[in-house]
Amino acid sequence: MRKLLASPFSSLLAVVFISVISVVRCCSPKDQTALNAFKSSLSEPNLGIFNTWSENTDCCKEWYGISCDPDSGRVTDISLRGESEDAIFQKAGRSGYMSGSIDPAVCDLTALTSLVLADWKGITGEIPPCITSLASLRILDLAGNKITGEIPAEIGKLSKLAVLNLAENQMSGEIPASLTSLIELKHLELTENGITGVIPADFGSLKMLSRVLLGRNELTGSIPESISGMERLADLDLSKNHIEGPIPEWMGNMKVLSLLNLDCNSLTGPIPGSLLSNSGLDVANLSRNALEGTIPDVFGSKTYLVSLDLSHNSLSGRIPDSLSSAKFVGHLDISHNKLCGRIPTGFPFDHLEATSFSDNQCLCGGPLTTSC
């Protein structure tokens, strides 16, 4: 019988196959221990998302919401959302509810790049201060819970952080001074908390920020001038705070600003003409302040406003004629001011209801019942 000899090519394949097998890593035992401690501080009774987190399975391969580095076996991502299109939510036909707190053991996951534990409605306690030791962290999203306490004072140590979302919690205290060291930050959302104090004067050093959502807090002081240098800023929401002073003229020079919400503050003075002539601005809500003067007559063929709300101020004078030359105005509310004169006819006024003009000093004409 002829003896079968392995060819050089088949031997090479065997070496490659063995090499590939050798680099497939299982979950780091240290990380698995940290995840078990993390799980033990949380309770999710409805969906059973922790059912896959078994001692007998590999956390990198079978644990819901966990991702690992394929080479090192270190845990890199925890992604657990209480509202999701994932099959586990669709099958249950409901959003999730989770209670408990964030165990400091999560800080032992030193390769973590993303920590998402959002929209569970019932997670309480404070953010562990040691979270600032996770040097690789790029995403921290804990929105939609009942987390208390302050933003960790040393948050600025997270030099790679790109997303910080702590919205819709019960947090207090001021914006830490170190936060302005997060030079990679692109998205900051602290909406609907109890954050106090002023916006840091050097806030504009966050040059990469495109979204700043700080509405529904207790912020005071004025809008820092340093924000004028944030050339990537597209969305700025400071609504429902206690911001005072004038709307800065430089806001009209922010080329990519598309959403500006300053509703329900204590802003005074006139509306800068440069702001309303900014052709990139899509949504502007300046309502419920103490703004005075006339509505700037600066609209034109490049004006494209999805929504313009100037209601509940002390604006006087006439509705500017140039508004009729705007390319598009979807929603307009100038009610509850001191405006006078005839409401222009034609676009965009022909599709607006009386509520857009009500409670002014002496406006007249359609759609109001007051004739001129």
UniProtKB/Swiss-Prot annotation:
UniProt cross-references to InterPro entries, sorted A to Z: DNA_repair-toleration, Leu-rich_rpt, LRR_dom_sf, LRR_N_plant-typ
One of the record's GO cellular component terms: chloroplast
Pfam families named among the record's database cross-references: LRR_1 (PF00560), LRR_8 (PF13855), LRRNT_2 (PF08263)
SUPFAM superfamilies registered for this protein in UniProt: L domain-like
Keywords for the protein's UniProt record, in alphabetical order: DNA damage, DNA repair, Leucine-rich repeat, Repeat, Signal
Source organism superkingdom: Eukaryota
Annotated GO biological process: DNA repair
Name listed for the protein in its UniProt record: DNA damage-repair/toleration protein DRT100
Species name: Arabidopsis thaliana
Highest classification ranks of the organism: Eukaryota, Viridiplantae, Streptophyta, Embryophyta, Tracheophyta
